């Protein structure tokens, strides 16, 4: 559903287009990679391994906010810190989830998506957590988009799903040269 909605509202439908979705996995699917080429919509990958949305919502909950309504507040807190203040937290997030070609690889130490993050984020300032989380999101999304761009030689992207509501990440992605 996310992929088709995003594609059909795309003003560049005639171009080779990668349609990527990323969300919290409410339907059991956390991400998809789709290609629209010469009038055909081709599903390339569907996975439950892209935990960016789940990590973001769980971290929002850990920070004492509603994960269904306040993720934008965490995104809004991110600019109020400096990378030197959150580098250790960023490394923790980066080690929890890696990009693996068109998919993602979850750290095998993670057994519970909530308590693993709660335990490891304990004692850190909320703004530093927010800054690290936002930076992590942008880094992993960029890697994913780059891999899709290289594999399919595509420059036109449509990005939908809950993670795509992160306007800071969208701005960051729109500034990249894929």
For each predicted feature, which ranges?
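Short acidic/glycine-rich loops and adjacent helix/strand connectors
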Residues: 1-178
């Amino acid at each position: 559903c996310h992929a088709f909605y995003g594609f059909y509202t795309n003003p560049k439908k005639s171009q080779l287009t990668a349609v990527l979705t990323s969300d919290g996995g409410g339907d059991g699917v956390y991400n998809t990679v789709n290609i629209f080429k010469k009038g055909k919509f081709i599903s390339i990958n569907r996975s439950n391994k892209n935990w960016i949305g789940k990590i973001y919502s769980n971290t929002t909950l850990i920070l004492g906010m509603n994960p269904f309504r306040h993720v934008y507040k965490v995104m809004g807190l991110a600019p109020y810190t400096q990378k030197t203040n959150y580098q250790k937290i960023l490394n923790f997030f980066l080690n929890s989830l890696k990009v693996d070609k068109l998919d993602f690889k979850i750290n095998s130490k993670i057994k519970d998506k909530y308590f693993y993050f709660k335990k490891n984020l304990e004692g850190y300032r909320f703004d530093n957590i927010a800054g690290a989380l936002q930076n992590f999101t942008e880094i992993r999304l960029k890697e994913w988009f780059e891999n899709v761009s290289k594999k399919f030689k595509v420059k036109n992207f449509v990005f939908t799903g809950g993670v795509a509501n992160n306007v800071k990440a969208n701005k960051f992605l729109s500034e990249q040269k894929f």
